Regions:
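N-terminal Rossmann-like NAD(P)+-binding domain of SDR-like oxidoreductases, especially those catalyzing
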Residues: 1-183
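Short, flexible, glycine-rich and Lys/Arg-enriched loop motifs at helix boundaries
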Residues: 38, 168, 179-199, 210-231
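Glycine-rich, flexible loop/turn motifs
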Residues: 40, 86, 132, 138, ...
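Short-chain dehydrogenase/reductase
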Residues: 97, 146-154, 190, 194-198, ...
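A general boundary/transition motif marking the beginning of the first structured unit of a protein
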Residues: 112, 191-196, 292, 311
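C-terminal substrate-binding subdomain of Rossmann-fold SDR/epimerase-dehydratase oxidoreductases
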Residues: 203-341
Length: 341
């Protein structure tokens, strides 16, 4: 079965390509390399000993999409492509809505014309806003979303639901991720944010290898056990395996699944686990809360276990261990010394 993976050179996309190839799927990737690097795909091939097909380009390029579908005839799409920085989305709402929404609409239009009606969408727990209750089940109402990035995830979910209502032949699976961290155990692929990392673990990783001085912990006065924000962290390899299960068990209609461990960890829990993984203290300082941050957000992943047979295998210590292994082997990410020169 041939799968088109949009944004397949990115962090979650590249790990999912590994799982797909290891499960004997044919993989075609389209990625504009805005947030990613082609080297990740070379390493996916090295890890798996298999080849994939890569098209560099944008979902906003309809001619390219038609060329891909003409040449490859994929049977299903896993859709990761999109701008993804919360802070940047507040500064650049027009770019975020145009890229993420218009790109998805063009993709779905070409899929429809080529009779490819199976899509797994990379959504996010951000659609729950400040959740009405925790742990969060899939029927938790969507909350107030405080940034354009989160709004695009919620809007794309609704677009895909509406497409499926209009044409029952569509199979739509919406995967709401919690907080993916970690890296492939080989240390060959991992998270490589450009510039100063926005997310907690890549930031800690840069501190651990001496690239950054110390971690800023935003708020220690939340209503949580140690006062710092609590999140559900999930190993990226577990998350990638969830996509393969979702693809394997696709059915007509719309299916929605939370992908998380069901376990909440505070910022300081993660700092402690990372210190253990790297064998050194992670210096940090407490800073004021960030606007829009919530106290606690963690999943109830029961539905994915019952319907997909999927369950996270890795705990926070393995997540931090694999993150540190990746960062130690690749202190400058995918960038080579020649590129830096």
């Amino acid at each position: 079965m041939k799968i088109l993976v949009t944004g397949g050179a990115g962090y979650i996309g590249s790990h999912t390509c590994v799982e797909l190839l290891n499960n004997d799927y044919e993989v075609v990737v389209v990625d504009n390399l805005y947030n990613s690097c082609e080297e990740a795909l070379n390493r996916v091939e090295k890890i798996t000993g298999k080849t994939l097909t890569f098209y560099e380009g944008d979902l906003l390029d309809q001619d390219l999409l038609e060329e891909i579908f003409d040449n490859e005839r994929p049977e299903a799409v896993i859709h990761f492509a999109g701008y993804k920085a919360v802070g940047e989305s507040v500064e650049k709402p027009i770019e975020y809505y145009h890229n993420n929404i218009t790109g998805t609409l063009l993709l779905c239009d070409v899929m429809r014309r080529y009779d490819c009606k199976k899509i797994v969408f990379s959504s996010s727990a951000t659609v729950y806003g400040d959740p009405a209750f925790v742990p969060i089940t899939e029927d938790c109402p969507k909350g107030v979303i405080t940034n354009p990035y989160g709004q695009t995830k919620s809007m794309i979910e609704q677009i895909l639901i509406d497409i499926q209502v209009s044409d029952p032949e569509w199979n739509v699976t919406l995967l709401r991720y919690f907080n993916p961290i970690g890296a492939h155990s080989s240390g060959l692929i991992g998270e490589d944010p450009k510039g100063i990392p926005n997310n907690l673990v890549p930031y800690i990783a840069r501190v651990a290898v001496g690239k950054l001085e110390k971690l800023g912990v935003f708020g220690n006065d939340y209503d949580t056990p140690d006062g710092t924000g609590v999140r559900d962290y999930i190993h990226v390899v577990d998350l990638a395996a969830g996509h393969v299960q979702a693809l394997r068990d696709m059915k007509q209609g719309v299916s929605i699944y939370n992908l998380g461990t069901g376990q909440g960890y505070s910022v300081l829990d993660v700092v402690k686990a990372y210190s253990k993984a790297c064998g050194k203290e992670i210096p940090y300082e407490i800073k004021p809360r960030r606007a829009g941050d919530i106290a606690a957000c963690y999943s109830d992943p029961t539905k994915a276990k019952e319907e997909l047979g999927w369950k996270a295998k890795y705990g926070i210590e393995e997540m931090c261990r694999d993150s540190y292994h990746w960062q130690s082997m690749n202190p400058d990410g995918y960038q080579t010394k020649q590129e830096q020169a």
